[in-house]
Amino acid sequence: MTQQPEILHYAVSVVGKDRSGIVAGISEVLFRLGCNLADSSCTMLAGEFAMILIVSHPRPFSKSRLFDELKPVCDSLGMSLALRTLQADEISRQETDGEICIISVYGADKPGIVYRVTSELARRGINITDLNTKLIGTPEEPVYVMMLEVALPEGETPEGIEKILANLKQELNVEIGVRVVTPVAF
């Protein structure tokens, strides 16, 4: 019985001034190389575009080759590039015992909103799986919006999280909502 070679995975990070064609340029290189795009997250923040990709290749494939192929495209797009080899235990999907919830926070912009909310969640062992913030409203009346996707540990409930965040809601003078994400089976 022959052993299958281990599939190599890399984390690819690309950051730079936003412009059209970034995703197409990077994904074209990955396609030409025969890489599979497993997970990705792309966003624009204050005119800067950032993408993080988890890519795999079924055959032995060096990190330096991947870098050498991506670097000219990144240079032509004015993007910085970083690569990291991932070990097998780093790419396994983490199953959560508890529920997945979305927490929304919004109110007048002020320092400390992210810190206060996330430190309270961390203190209770709640893992943040996604976090986005945005300043909306007008220059005269800015409104800060934060959306978090969290995985509740065993024993925590959405109602319990609402209770703990109720104190912060008053202290920070913000609105905080918690809702459960219902998984969909495919």
Locate predicted features:
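A conserved regulatory-domain signal marking ACT and ACT-like small-molecule sensing domains
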Residues: 1-186
